[in-house]
């Protein structure tokens, strides 16, 4: 090979280290070595590949030629380091600090070291013993760890089923016992039960809600309601409860005041002064200071009197008139009970003193519908205690002749004869 300096050839050198001829043709690609030009050199590697693994000692960091295998922990070091620690008096393994019984010497290639886990490094004299160690110590342990982790995660993925009967013991401080039936054994999940309890807790209970203080009415006399029972809603609304035709009830039932319809489409106005006493035995009447809002935990039974009207679904709608204190009853068109006449004076005609200057007429009377059940906030306890605000019986406007029972039905006969005109619903 001719070795000539690079400047004697007709080539140009660029910054990338390539030589080009003057004809802009690529001649050769060489390394940038000043003053030399390399040619093609063949290299032959003589030797054999060593398949035996080479391990390094953990103490001296040198390749191990002769292993010093410690029994019983089976950790291996170079033979010099293993004997050095034994001579000095350290009768424990330098890696695991386990007591040393003896030290075995093995040549390179006769020891198989576990490399599955970096911290293990236990040695075995055969490949079969090494595989048994890997299956026993590493694969089974890995499966156990995986199954244990799945058991910890599983309750969060699928919560266990809980019976409703077991929940009141856990929620005693949350006042949910009254909303959970104790004898139900329905299997439901815990989130749905909490959602159901939260909804029942947020719903207003009609039978335990107390009326607002500004709408509580106090009458100067006990009013007995027979055909309807009034209880308050969330905002003090009056609701009519349907009755049952059963006159054997011994408990006290509220009695409505007498009323009469006006042409079957006008709201009837009645006064609570003329209430005929009943012959049945009742509990002591409520005090005059107690509100009119009666709580009926069970469906009221029908205690029928001459003053009661046959009630069917939908029931009557009652409300108070703010200007005069009258009780206005909306009579549905399907009410076929005979209207009752108003009490008369001694000569048989309405008394002239009953028509006071503060009484209202039918034109000024507000028209109430069946959906309008709220009390007017203008009616206060002061108006209820004032006896002058409760007028006597009177007719508001002339009405076409309607069917009416004889006067003896109101005063002479017993009220038990009036019960035969009522039917169950």
Swiss-Prot record:
Exclusively expressed in testis and sperm, including spermatocytes, round and elongated spermatids, and Leydig cells. It is an enzyme of class 2 (transferase). It is found in: Cytoplasm. It catalyses: S-ubiquitinyl-[E2 ubiquitin-conjugating enzyme]-L-cysteine + [acceptor protein]-L-lysine = [E2 ubiquitin-conjugating enzyme]-L-cysteine + N(6)-ubiquitinyl-[acceptor protein]-L-lysine. Keywords: Cytoplasm, Metal-binding, Transferase, Ubl conjugation pathway, Zinc, Zinc-finger. Transmembrane segments: none annotated. Pathway: Protein modification; protein ubiquitination. Its EC number is 2.3.2.27. A zinc finger (C2H2-type) spans 112-138. InterPro entries: HAKAI-like_RING-HC, HAKAI/CBLL2, Znf_C2H2_type, Znf_Hakai, Znf_RING, Znf_RING/FYVE/PHD, Znf_RING_CS. E3 ubiquitin ligase catalyzing the covalent attachment of ubiquitin moieties onto substrate proteins. May operate on tyrosine-phosphorylated SRC substrates. Homodimer. PANTHER family: E3 UBIQUITIN-PROTEIN LIGASE CBLL2, E3 UBIQUITIN-PROTEIN LIGASE HAKAI-RELATED. This is E3 ubiquitin-protein ligase CBLL2. It comes from Homo sapiens. The lineage of its organism: Eukaryota, Metazoa, Chordata, Craniata, Vertebrata. The gene is CBLL2.
């Amino acid at each position: 090979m001719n070795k000539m300096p690079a400047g004697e050839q007709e080539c140009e050198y660029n910054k990338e280290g390539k030589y080009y001829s003057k004809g802009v043709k690529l001649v050769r690609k060489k390394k940038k070595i000043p003053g030399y030009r390399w040619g093609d050199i063949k290299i032959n590697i003589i030797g054999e590949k060593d398949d035996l693994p080479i391990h390094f000692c953990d103490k001296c960091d040198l390749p191990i030629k002769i292993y010093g295998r410690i029994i019983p922990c089976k950790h291996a070091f170079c033979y010099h380091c293993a004997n050095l620690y034994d001579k000095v008096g350290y009768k424990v393994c330098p890696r695991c600090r386990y007591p040393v019984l003896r030290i075995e010497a093995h040549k390179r290639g006769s020891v198989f070291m576990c490399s599955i886990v970096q911290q293990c490094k236990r040695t075995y004299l055969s490949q079969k013993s090494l595989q048994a160690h890997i299956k026993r110590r590493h694969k089974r342990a890995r499966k156990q760890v995986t199954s244990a982790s799945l058991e910890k995660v599983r309750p969060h993925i699928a919560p266990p089923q809980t019976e409703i009967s077991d929940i009141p013991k856990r929620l005693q401080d949350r006042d949910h016992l009254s909303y959970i039936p104790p004898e139900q054994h329905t299997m439901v999940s815990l989130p749905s039960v909490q959602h159901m309890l939260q909804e029942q807790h947020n719903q207003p209970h009609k039978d335990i809600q107390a009326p607002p203080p500004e709408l509580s009415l106090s009458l100067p006399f006990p009013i007995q309601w027979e055909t309807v029972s009034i209880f308050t809603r969330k905002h003090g609304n009056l609701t009519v409860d349907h009755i049952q035709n059963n006159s054997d009830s011994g408990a006290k039932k509220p009695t409505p005041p007498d009323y009469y319809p006006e042409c079957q489409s006008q709201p009837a106005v009645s006064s609570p002064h003329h209430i005929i006493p009943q012959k049945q035995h009742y509990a002591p009447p409520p005090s005059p200071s107690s509100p009119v809002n009666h709580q009926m935990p069970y469906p009221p039974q029908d205690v029928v009197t001459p003053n009661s009207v046959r009630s069917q679904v939908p029931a009557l709608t009652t409300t108070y008139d703010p200007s005069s204190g009258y009780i206005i009853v909306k009579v549905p068109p399907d009410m076929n009970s005979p209207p009752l006449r108003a009490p008369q004076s001694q000569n048989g005609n309405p008394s002239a003193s009953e028509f006071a200057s503060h009484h209202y007429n039918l034109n000024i009377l507000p028209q109430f519908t069946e959906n309008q059940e709220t009390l007017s906030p203008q009616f206060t306890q002061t108006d209820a205690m004032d006896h002058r605000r409760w007028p006597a019986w009177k007719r508001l406007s002339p009405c076409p002749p309607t069917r009416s029972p004889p006067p003896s039905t109101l005063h002479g006969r017993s009220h038990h004869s009036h019960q035969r005109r009522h039917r169950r619903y």
